[in-house]
Each structure stands twice: as structure tokens, then as C-alpha cells.
Amino acid sequence: MRKRHLRLGQQMWALLCKNWLRKFRMRRETLLEWLFSLLLILFVYQLSSNLHQVHDAPEMSVVDLGRVDNFNDSNYMMVFAPESEATHEIMNKVASAPFMKGRTIVACPDEKSMNELDLNYSIDAVRVIFKDTFSYHLKFSWGQRIPKTKEHKDHSAPCEPLNNKMICENSAFWEKGFVAFQAAINAGIIEMITNHSVMEELMSVIGSNMKMPPFIAQGGVATDFFIFFCVISFSSLIYYLSVNITQERQYMTTLMAMMGLRESAFWLSWSLMYAGFILVVAVLMSLIVKSAQVVVLTGFMVVFLLFLFYGLSLITLSFLMSVLIKKPFLTGLAIFILTVFWGSLGFTALYKHLPAFVEWTLCFLSPFAFTTGMAQLIHLDYDVNSNVNLNSPNNSYLIMATLFMLVLDALLYLVLALYFDKITLSKYGHQRSPLFFLKSSYWFKRRGASHVVLENEIDSDPSLNDSLEPVSPEFQGKEAIRIKNLKKEYSGKHGKVEALRGLGFDIYEGQITALLGHSGAGKTTLINTLSGLSPPTTGSVTIYNQTVSEMDDSDAVLTITGVCPQSNVQFGFLTVRENLRLFAKIKGILPHEVEQEVQQVLQDLEMENIQDILAQNLSGGQKRKLTLGIAILGDPQVLLLDEPTAGLDPLSRHRIWNLLKERRAGRVIVFSTQFMDEADILADRKVFISNGRLKCAGSSLFLKKKWGIGYHLSLHLNEACDPEGITSLVKKHISDARLTTQSEERLVYILPLERTNKFPDLYRDLDRCSNQGIEDYGVSMTTLNEVFLKLEGKSMADESDVGICGRLQSDGARDMESLVELEQVLSLDSSGSSVSGMALWRQQLCAVAKVRFFKLKNERKSLMTVLLLFGISFVPQLLEHLVYKVYHKSYSWGLSPSMYFLSPGQPPQDPLTHLLVINRTGSSIDNFVHALRQQGIALDLDALGTRNGTEEALYNGAITVLGEEKALRFSVACNAKRLNCFPVLMDIISNGLLGIFNSSERIQTDRSTVFEEHMLYEYGFMSNAFFWIPVAASLTPYIAMGSISDHKKKVLSQLWTSGLYPSAYWCGQALVDIPIYFLILFLMQIMDSVFSSEEFISVMESLLIQIPCSIGYASSLIFMTYVISFIFRNGRKNSGIWSFFFLIVTIFFIIATDINEYGFLELLICTFLVPPFTLIGSLLIFSEVSYDSVDYLGTSESQLVFLALLIPYLHFLLFFFILRCLERYLRKKSLRVDPVFRISPRSCPAVPNPEEPGEEDEDVQMERVRTTGAMATLQTDEKPVIIASCLRKEYIGRTKRCFSKMKKKIATRNISFCVKKGEVLGLLGHNGAGKSTTISMITGDTIPTAGQVFLKGSGGGAALGFLGYCPQENVLWPNLTVKEHLELYAAVKGLKKKDAVVTITRLVNALKLQDHLKALVRTLSEGVKRKLCFVLSILGNPPVVLLDEPSTGMDPEGQQQMWQAIRATFTNTERGALLTTHYMAEAEAVCDRVAIMVSGRLRCIGSIQHLKSKFGKDYLLEMKVKTPSQVEPLNTEIMRLFPQAARQERYSSLMVYKLPVEDVRPLSEAFFKLERLKENFDLEEYSLSQSTLEQVFLELSKEQELDDFGEEANSSVKWKLLPQEEL
């Protein structure tokens, strides 16, 4: 063991390097991340350069606006409502105003009739609407006589230079008549109420703008947009950060934590990297802000710190959201939405003055705090006298407080992320109490605490004593792992699920322990609990007296433990070496030992040749080896391995077994597996778990003796054998022997274990019967598979192929009946009820369309994108419509003193001030002042008249009272920053005069705006089409690119193999895609019509034009997308990129083909040549073509209209033809004649093999002779179903140099074999032996370089129609149900609907899939998926079936069901099957014959017993003694009886030997000797077993080909036997 110290710094640096490598290796993601960021920065820079305006205004002098009655405008009329005596009286007095002479005044009954009044738009209408006698509002057309904005923003310019003088916006009230109309109406109201005329007093009011100090103002809306884009400037970086973190937390962080990863190292690694990214963007944004003068007076460092702290707060916010939200995309989306929403909320600080408490509370939202900070900088710029400097305490308080809040936000989000990470339930069940931080145990680790056994931890199941083998004396006291009453519960959909139910046993140092059980038994849960990945519900687990569930002991446990979880643990963007180096540092291996340890692991697992390959490019088996390598880093004392050899070929699996055996001494190795032979060969102790409970535990010998069904006697026969006679002979010696398997070449019997004393006589008689057709025989012990099935309550003898293949002898008639029924169901011939030709094409078309509809319905992401784009297409129209609705509805803006002036006793509040009143009458104005105070205004009175109102810029407004006491005159001065100041002061003066006359009433004036309807809809229906048609063109990639995923999942290849017509596939897709796309287009047109202002008839006419164009456009664009998806089928789907491409192309040609500039001919050409532009081009032709253009082209208008309508249909036919050509020349060969595409099956020419067979095994030579004879025979009925003759396949390899000779790689060399009717031939070989290439040549995916393939007597499979193929991967649609899959393949293979229902029902019942028919495939277990793939392969009764690893991933029970089904499907039928597998037990159970490939050649072929006898080198002898003292004498006797015996295991009670075949033969003599040993030494039990097929395969796989692939094709083959390893 290596020393391991978990160091935070080492882990953080390792993860940081990993993150940088991720950015470098995943260039596409990094490019998009920075591209979006830089584009946003460039856009902000462009916005600031072109649109942003900064007004650096100098000091502005007083502007005199003159008297109110100076207004003189004749181009208006007045309209008032409602019509009453009071309003008539008021308006009659208004008519007496000087500026009203000769003006028309119109009365309306109410406001509604006023709006309906047909006015001449050339004359401005001043609308006066009275609420009551004292309240009214003046209503003007939008933008007429009053400013467009309701109020100045604090950062906008109140005055702008024009013709060398400053023009202030508030002057419009004075100069364009609003104040004049207001004064006249107010005078009329006062005179009506008081009978005193004040017309002269109000008409003589003099207005002026106050002197204004210098100011810096921003340019309105552009500034708002600029700030908004500053808020989202980090969005791209933060989005990818949140996605990356959420992905790692979801898949890797917990697994790395059980290897010792510190949480803080994980967060720091991402923080440091993205802090650097934030730093770069913050510098760039700060430079733009300063260069664009968005902030002028504030220093660069302050702006930079504002951006930097804001970016850092977003980093920690992404940490928090990644903890709360588990989906990567949703995390990124949520952060973006929160950033936009909170940032937009911050604009209230720019426009409104919020209460301090509310503003500082909202600053806990960092985007709000950032927007507030930007607003503060802009406000401080607004006054030249203020400045921001970090060293200036007087002016920098607010911005310093904002910076502090951003830092506080970052820390707060980080603390919350760490807190919620602790208390939220993790994937594996970790969760702390919400108040965990209040417990002292969290902060202070307990020292020297010893484990106390609690009452609920004591094992309480004494009934298991008989099922547990006693531990050998040498292991007593070496209990390394102690499991006490372990229970684990999960919360499932239907309540709590008990994964472990009171499990309790010990695991010992120096032993390899295997955990066995069915799927869902609790093996993985137990491994996760032992590793600390999943905490137990109750009970305890201790590893070397350290409690796994105690956090205090976690470091001690982690430093001695290595874990290989069920899922692969590696980063795909790192190489093998980099992955090992990363995890070595995480595990705390000392830095100077890391490289040495990594190199050692690479050597141990033989991965030196792949050490520089990215993990994502490794095969499944190589990834598994890498995960195991990560587990054994640091040579841990405890190894916990969850299915460590899953997906490995037998040779690699065997090497790992040897590695684990070498590391067994002084260590604890626990592994789970569903591969019983692995447990039998590798494990010293097997622990069976069933439904979370311990079933039994012990050595193989103990388990087989107690639960085994007996010895297997296998006989290899020839044609002269009489099976009946052999059975009689066996039963004469052992009456209770059972025949389990019978075929032409073999018989298999089960002999009870207790009858070993009868074996010598039986084998002696068998040796004498060699002339009766017995070529060879062998004996093997019961397997752990049989033990497993018996423990699960099922007998392998009853569940295997007993009676399916021939004669069945079973203890129960019920089992016999069920198995015979299964054989009848699976061998059912449905070929007579199939359809063909156009009827089959129509059936396939409907089936594909149905599946396409279901797929589209379940593709939520694509549907959401389509709906989003659909909505986006109408955003401009909707906004236009909303603007109209908002402005069409009259709104009032109340004008009151509280807008600008404080009330008495009110504390100072920016921007309110006192109202300055200056008395220059020379007498008292107490009555007027009293009337002002009665309005609730705080006054600042200058009774002596020494102050000048126009010089007082600190006030919002000032009133100077002139004249005499009874003939007062007024002068008003306004601060230009207060937009509505003049109307407010006019109301104040009017109410003051009203108060002088002792009236308590108050006049209230409101300003109002009306939006004229004629201002909307200026461009007609085509203006809206310019928005929605480009978006519509961008929708097709999201609808019609499903074939790419079908191709990548190999579903298309499976469909072609099953006999699907290519044209039926594409047309079936189009049958759904085109109507859906047309429906979207139609809805867009309907929405366009809804927003249109045209009359109903015009709308219907435009729809009649658009609909036929849209049908053709939908068809052409969908098929164009099909062509694109076919061409780029091997790449990514990239729907978004193609959508963007279609959008840009359409917009470009809309701009480029402006008919007024380029003419009709260019428009017609672009419409024809650019399919995405076709729809809008056709509509433009209909809507814009003039008669002059028609005459110029020399044709009639009707013909042009027809041509425009025809263009999309011509595109559709063109793309349909292109798709047909692509299918014909680029796709694999078709198995049927396509009636639409007219594609016929292509026959491959027979090319003679240039290489002679050379030296071959005699069985291989005989098979080659049989293959040649089968090809030559003319009798079709006698031909095998598969004939592979002299197959050779060469691949052209890549070269590193441009002019070097291309190297040839030969995958297969001169392969010849045949599969007879009713036969299952197993094709075995290690990875790279050529199995997959051979299968590809048989299916037609790969064309042989030489040789021929005949399927059921016809070369190339032309007459076959379809193949049955069960690939290794589950080529299924995850979002479709089992029933939908079955119905599709039944239709594709030609079964009529009525017959398909019956066939599907029978197959589903036979394979026990009834409960899963309506379940989605993604919810199924691996075993059910494999069953479904098998059913799909045999559906339709195909004569040729190819089975590639049919039972991979299934538990032993599921495997037995699958093997039984395979045997029942092919035995005694006209069908044949070729099966490839890495699982030798599967080959033994299913195959009639086995062919083993080595380096592209057939090494051997024959029955299993024949290969065992011919290539098996050893027998395995196991003996268990009762007392240790017998070991040495027994060993001496064994060596005397079997001189070449090699001892394998050295335990005190268990003795294991390898016996060469020479020492064992004859078997009768070997068993005679063993029986004598049993009697003389009082053995508890013994077993003698022949080499398994696994061991034969391993021996043959050691032979490696030495040919250089660059040699000529006729080079000879050399074989080398590598050094023998232990088996």
C-alpha cells in the first residue's frame, strides 16, 4: 500500500488542470462560450458607439419664455366633453382668451362621441374632458404640444443644443399652448365659481427656465439598453459554468467524493478558472463603459471593481442554482432568467427613488445591486460638482456600499450553496439535518471513539446457520468488514423500497468475496453502502473497526479503500493517462509517486497502447478497465468492485482475474457480478443475496454440494450412435440419471452428486462402447448458474432446453407442457400470412408515419423550440399591436404639487424641494401665502424680495409675486430637469387665487395623450410576412431531422435489415412532418390575418394565395431537410445551426431582392434557386408584380402566377429525386425491390480469395469442404440457411505521410462455414478477432473483398426479403412503448394486421413481456430490452437470424429464459442462427456447434464437447477435508496418484489441484482413485470437473497473429503460443 494524504491544494490544482484541459479539448463548447461573450461585447461596443449619446452640457443661463398670452397658433380647434351648462359656461369664458379669437370650440355629449368625431387630421384637436367642475384633463395627439415622455429620467438631458442655443423639453408646455389652454380654462372655472375674472392675472404670467449648472446626461433608451447588456454581459460564461458544474455534480462529484475529494477543492477549481474569465470580460466591459462615456467622472478602477464583483457574485449564484436544480440546461436557463429579471428590477433605481430599506434589501440580488451601482454612477455624473473616488469618503459612500453588497452577495450565495448541498437529498441518499451546523459533532471530531454494537445491529437470523459455510481457522480473527443488521430504504414512486433487509455477515482479509444475486437483489446497494456512497438506514458497516457511516472515520476509510462503481468513472475529454493522474492526486497519492503509480497501473492492466487516447473514444471494455485502474490506484487495502469486468472479452477478463488474485494477500477484495463463472473461478467465498436478504455464503464446493443438481456427463456422438441404447446404459448404473440435452451430435445427462461411487463402473462401460458411436465424453461439476437458479426456486434442468431439443425427462408433467408449448409458439410459421409489393409499401408507410408521430410527440425539446420560435415570429406584430392598444386607450398623467414639492413637516427627500415664493409687491401677500399652504406645500418665503427665482437652481420651482395686493401679477421659474413644472405651478397659482376668494375647492389638471388609428398598419400584409416567414423557414430542422438520430442509434440499419423499403421510410416521415409544418405555416398566416387591419375579403384572398404556396413550400423544405440530414447523417444533429442558417439565408435574400431596386427577374431567379426563400418570393410575385413587368417578360399575368405557384412543387420533386439517388448509391444494399424508388437488391460479384487456406485445423478443413459442397448442390432444400465461403475483408488504413503507401488491414482471412437448418452456430473470438466484420458481411452492411455469402440458397439475400437481427446494442426508440415497436416491425416484415396481433400476443406471452407492453423503452430494465430485441429479430419467422450477444446485461435467471427461448425458436425448424458472444456459458447452453476465430481466421469448429476434449488441457479437482491435520498426508497421496498435479489454493480445509488430461484418463480410473481417497481420508466432499469452454477459449485466444498487415495478401500465417497463464 502507498501512503495517501488527502490534501486540499493538490486536489484543487488537479481539478483546475482538468478544467483547463476541458476547455482546450472541448473546443466547440469553448468557442461558443467565448464567441457569444465576445459578440455581446462587440454589440455593446457598437451600441455605445452608434446609438449612445452623452450630453456634456455647460452652464445654461436663464431662458425667458415670455407671457402666457404670447401663444399664437391658429392651426387647432377645441373639443370638450361632456356637454353641460357648467362646461358650456367655462368654455365660453375660455373663448374670451386673447389666443382663442376666431378658434372653433365644439361640444360633445361624452368622451366616446368625442373619439368618434370625424375630424380633419390636418387640424390639431385640443380635447378637454371634464371629470367635474374643478377637474379636467387636456388631451392631445401623441407627440403634439406636449412632450412624449411623462417625466424626465434622472440621467437624461433636459435641454439639448439647437442652433447655438439650448432648447429645454419642458418649454414645450409653455411655447405650444398647454399652459395657455390650462390658464384659460382655470380662469373660466374661477370666474364661474367666484364671479371674479382672473383672466388677466393668469394670461400675464411670465415663465422662465432657471439658470442651470453644468451637467452630464445620457441618451435615453440607448443608455437603458446599454445597462441591460452590461447586466447580461457574463451570461454566456455563467451559462456554461452552471451547465458544467451541474453535469459534474450529477455524474461525477459524488463518485469522486468517495475517493476522497474535498468539496471545497471542487468549488475552488471552478471558481478560480472562471474568476480569470470574469476578469477578462470585466476589463473589456470597463474599457467600453469608459470609452463610450457611459460613466464619465468615475475612475476606471471603480467601474472595473463593479463589473468584477458582479461577475464573481454570478459565479457563486451558479453554484447555488446547480445545487438546487439538478438538470444542467434548466440550471443555466434559470440563472439567465434570474439575471434578466433581477437586473431589470434594478432599473427602478434608475427611474424611481425607492425607500432606502427596500433598495438595500433588493441589493441582496446581485443583478439588482449591479444595476443600482450603474445607476448611481450615472446619477453622480449628472451633476458635474460630484465625483467618485475610492479615496473620497464624502462622495463614494453609495458606490462603496454597492461594491460591499456585491461582495456580500457572492459570499452569501456561496454559503447558501454549501448549506443546501449538505441538506438536500443526494442521488445516493446523503442528507444532513437542516440544523447540522449547530451540532458540536460537525465542528469537532471525536477522538478514539470505539464502535458500540447496538441492539438493532445484532444479527437475528439463526436459520441461516446451515446455509453459511464455517470459516477456516486461518481466517478467524481476520474479519476486515463487518456488516451488522444492515437495512437500506429508498423512496420510490409507490412508497418506500427496501433494498437491503437486515443483512449481516463478515468479509475476511486475504479472501476474494463475490456478491451474487438476481437483478435488484441489493448487490450494488451493498457496494455503495460499503464504499460510503450511500448511507444505511439502520445497522452498521465497519471496515477495520472504522464505521463507514460516521463522518469522523470517513478519511480513515477513504485512504484505504478503492472503489469501482457500476457506472464508468472517467472524464471523456481526458486521456487514459490523464484520468489516472487526476484520480491519483484526488486520492492523495504523494506528488512524487503519482507518475510511478500511474505507469504501474497502465502496465498491470495492459493499457500502455491506449494511454494517450481520449476516454470518450475508448470501447466499453476499455472504459471499464480504466475505471478499474482508477480503483486500484494507490494499491488500496480494501477493493470494492461492482461488476468490474462487465463488457470485457474473456481474455481481458482473465487477465483482470489474475491481477486480483495477485493482490489478494493481505487485502480485502469484494466484487459483485452476474457472471457466475467469474465468481466460480475468481472468488474464494461467494455470498448469495436475494431481495435484500442473505441467502447463503461459502466456497464453490460447499455451494455446489449443497444446492447443485449433479455432474454433467456430456457425450460427443457420430451418426452410428443409438441414443436409446446409451440412455439405457447410463440408467443401468445410475437409475436416477436424467437426459437433459439431445441433438445429432451430443447427449447430456445429469448424474446426482451422491452417486459418485457408481461413476467408475459407468465410465468403464462407456469406454468399452467407443464402437457404438461415442467419439468422446467428459464430465463437469454442477455450475454456480444451477446453484443460483435452485436458490431462486427454479431448477436449471427444468428451465433449460430440456425436452425442447428432443427427449425430455422431467419430474413434473406441468414443466413438460409449458416447455413444449413454448417451442410451439416460438417455432410458429407466419410466412404464409404476409403481404408484398405496393400493399406492403402502404403498410410500411402507415407504420412509419405512426411511429414518427409518436416520436415527434415525445420530443419535448424540439416541440418547445418550435413553439418558442412560433411565438418569436409574432413578437414584432404583438408589440406593435400592444403599443397601439396602450396608446389608443386614453391615459391621464396627474399634475400635482407633490410631484416636485415637499409637504409641510415632510423630511427631505430627493428630488423634492420647498417651493420658493418671492414677494416683490412691496406689501403683504399673506392671503396668497396662506392659500398656497392650504394646498399642502412646504414654502420657502422670501418676504423682502431679495432673491432671484431664476438663479435658484437648488429649487424645483419658484413663484415671484409682483403688482399690487388687489392686482397681483406672477412670474414663474422652473428647474429644466422637472418636465411638468410649468403646468404644476400654473395650477398652484390658480388654486392660490381661488383661495384668496375664500373657496376651499381645488383645480386639478391632468395631461392626456391619444394615439390615432391612422398611425398604425402602414405597410399591408407583406410587412408582417417579412417577420414570420424567415422564422417559419428555420423551423424545419427541428421537425425533419429525426433521421440523423435514427441513423446514429442504428435504428435505420435495423429497419433496412428487417426489410423496410427506403421510400416507405422517407414518405412515412413526410406523411407526418409535412402536415405538421403546413399547420404551423397556416397558423402563422391566421395570426398574421388576426393582426391585419385589412378587410375580411382581402384577408381571405391573401389566404387563398398563401395556402397552395405553403403546401408546396412545406413539402419542398421538408424534403430538402431530409437530403441535408442524409448527407450529414454521421455528424451531430445540429438542428439549431441549420435553423440559424435557414433564417439567415431567408433574411439575406429578403433584403437582397428588394423588387423596387433589383427588379422582377432577380426576384424570380432567387425564388427558384433558394428554397427557403420560395414562399416569400412567391408571395412577393403575387403582391408586387406590376403589369409593366409582365409585358417586359413577354407572358401573361396568369402564367406568371401559375409559375410562382409551381416553383415549390418543382423543388419538392427535385429533392425527392436527389433523396432517391442518395439511397441508391450511398446506402447499404436493399433486401427488397423498392416499388417507389425503384431500387433493386444489388448482387456482389464473386471474387476469388487470393490467399490459400494454408495450415488449418482438420475440423476447419472439413467445414470448408462441406461449404464448397453446399454451394455446388442444386437441391435447395438440402442447402444450409447461411453459407459463408472464403470470406476476406481488407480495409485501407491511414498513413501519417502524404506520399507513403497505404497500408492494408485484413480483418478476416478465408473464412468458410455454414449454418444448417435448425442449427445455432456460435461464433466466438476476442475483441478484434473479426466477428463483427463477418456479421457485417452477412447482413450486407459490408461488401467482402473476396468470397461470397449465400443466405438460404440465394447469393446476396435477394430472395430473402428480410433478416432477423438482434444487435448487441439495444437499437430501440427510448420514447416508444414495447407494443409500438412490435407493431412497427410486424408491419415492416409484412405481417397482416390481424395475423400480427396473434403473433405478437404469442411471442409476448412466451417471453413474459405482458406487463411491459405499454411501458416506454427508457423505463425498462436491461433484461427486458434484450428480450424485446430478440422478439423483434424473430418476428415474421425469418429463415436467417443473427444474434449478437443476445443475453448481455441480464441476470442468470433472465439469461436462462433467453437461452431457453433461443433453443425453442430454432430446434427442428427451417430456420438457422449465427450467434456471437463473449459469454462462454451462453455458447454452451445455446449452440449446437461453436467456431472460434483468432486473428481473422477460423481456429477451430465443432461441438462443445468435441472442442473440450480436443483442446481442454486440464481437469480441476477440489477436495474439502474435515481436519487440518489431514492436509499434508492427503497432498502426498494426491501427488502419488496424479504425478503431474499442480496445487492451486493453499487453505487449511480446501485443497484445489489442476490435473492434466493424461493423468485423468480414463475417467473410470480417476473416479475409482478418488473414491478410495474419500474413504481412506474421510473427505467431507470432492469434485472433479473437465475444462470449461471458457478455459478452452482462453487457451486458443493466446495464439496471436504475427503477420504484418502491410504485407502482401498471399503471405503465410504464423501462430505463436504465448506463455501460459493460470486458469
Swiss-Prot record:
Highly expressed in heart and to lower extent in kidney, brain and spleen. Weakly expressed in developing and adult brains. Weakly expressed in the cerebellar granular layer at P14 and P21. It is a multi-pass membrane protein. Residues 481-716, 1287-1520 form the ABC transporter domain. It is found in: Membrane. InterPro entries: AAA+_ATPase, ABC2_TM, ABC_transporter-like_ATP-bd, ABC_transporter-like_CS, ABCA, P-loop_NTPase, R2_ABCA1-4-like. ATP 2 binds at residues 1325-1332. It holds the Pfam family ABC_tran. It comes from the Eukaryota. SMART domains: AAA (SM00382). Keywords: ATP-binding, Glycoprotein, Membrane, Nucleotide-binding, Repeat, Translocase, Transmembrane, Transmembrane helix, Transport. Induction: Down-regulated by digoxin. One of its GO terms (cellular component) is membrane. ATP 1 binds at residues 517-524. CDD domains: ABC_subfamily_A (cd03263). Glycans are attached at residue 120. GO terms for molecular function: ABC-type transporter activity; ATP binding; ATP hydrolysis activity. Its EC number is 7.6.2.-. The chain crosses the membrane at residues 31-51, 225-245, 265-285, 295-315, 329-349, 354-374, 398-418, 863-883, 1025-1045, 1071-1091, 1107-1127, 1135-1155, 1163-1183, 1199-1219. Belongs to the ABC transporter superfamily. ABCA family. Transporter that may play a role in monocyte differentiation and lipid transport and homeostasis. This is ATP-binding cassette sub-family A member 9.
